[in-house]
Structure formats: structure tokens, C-alpha cells
């Protein structure tokens, strides 16, 4: 039986929600939210990323979108309450961006 081993990084300088494998970073009056490399490792192949629309109000731990994987669809839980001010359209167009650079170009949403 083969065994998959996680070989990712968990950068300093971010805040983490270990229960939902999400990270956030303060950027002025906004926060940037994304999935951790470990959370994406657990999800496997990401086929689609679908965030809620800009302007949506999201309570802490409630869903702000979904990722569709090879075998399931997973809800993405907000680590803080926020109103979505931007969604990563590049990651929507090419969900592999989330896996390639989860802490940079693979951010998911911004909010206030």
C-alpha cells in the first residue's frame, strides 16, 4: 500500500484556523484568506474553486465558497466574520493556482 507524505510549508506571519485549514493575513483594512498547503494536500486534486459573490456577508466559521475535488465538494469556512470585497478570479479560472502557490497567488478571498 502506498503512503502519501505531506511536504509543504507553513509560513510565519499569518494567522491560522487549524480546525478548517485556513489562513488569513491582515492587509490594511482588509484581510486576505486562503487554504493552507496542508488543507489542500488533504483535499487532493482541486477541480474547481467557487467563492461567494463580492459583497456577501460571511459569519465566522460559515462558508464563503467551495472547492470541488476529484471525489467530493468541500465547504470553505471563514476564519473571521467578513464582507467579501474581492475574489481570486485567476484561481477560479485555473484552480491549480491554489495548489501551486497557496500563500501567494492562490489566495481565495479578501474581505473587510
Describe these PLM feature segments.
Residues 21, 55, 77-86:
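Generic structural motif
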Residues 50, 57, 68-69, 74-78:
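Small beta-strand-rich domains/subdomains or short beta-sheet motifs embedded
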Residues 63-72, 90-91:
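Short, charged beta-turn/beta-strand-edge "cap" motif at the junction between a beta-strand
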